[in-house]
Amino acid sequence: MREFVYYSRTAPTAGNSIGKDLQEAGRIDIAVHTVIGVFFLSHKIRSDAKLHLLFAGPPDPVKHLEIQPVTEGKTGIDKIYLSKKDVSGILKRMLYKYREGERREVFPGFHIEKKNFLEVVRDLSEKGRNLYVLDPDGEDIRTADIKENPVFILGDHKGLPDKEFKRLKQLCTPITIGKRTYFASQTVSVVNNELDRREDEGRLPRE
């Protein structure tokens, strides 16, 4: 299983903060494109990926939205397919369904809770995941030793907070996808492509 952790300093933490203009809604448009980059192939949704969204914008930070879409069965009351056309609507509904003090499953595979960024990262570390943080000064992903069950951590257009980033370097291996700066959605697509290649070549176990 490959996992991604996306941290946004500005993404809203209440459903009523998300309107039609996604850029004005704390740049949640970046999170939407990141969801698409993590899960969508042509005519297919990945079943080997999980995404952790950490929203630290107003009014009630930090919200942890965990997404691992159901890819089998019928859509309806008890199951939901992830649709590119309505990612923002799904995130909005998840935020509306949050209840204080609960980790709540909004749809099968879609959970929300209040949890800070480093707590999520530490939990993944304690589960034995191999952690990698996107860092311009890190090792090139093409030559890096990517181990089984990797987790890749990245920030929004403002990047990861300096204090948290310093702590992350103690838990994670810094890697880069190149010298140029890419959108978060492009970054996860590049990482996915590298993992796909390694799996296809037998250099990384396939989920």
Regions picked out by a protein language model, each given a short descriptive name:
Residues 11-14, 59-61, 138-141, 157-160:
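Short acidic, S/G/P-rich loop/turn micro-motifs used as interaction or catalytic elements
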Residues 29, 154-159, 181-185:
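Short, amphipathic alpha-helical segments
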Residues 162-207:
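Structured adenosyl-cofactor binding patch, chiefly the S-adenosyl-L-methionine
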Residues 56-58, 62, 67-69, 136-145, ...:
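Extended interaction regions within the primary functional domain
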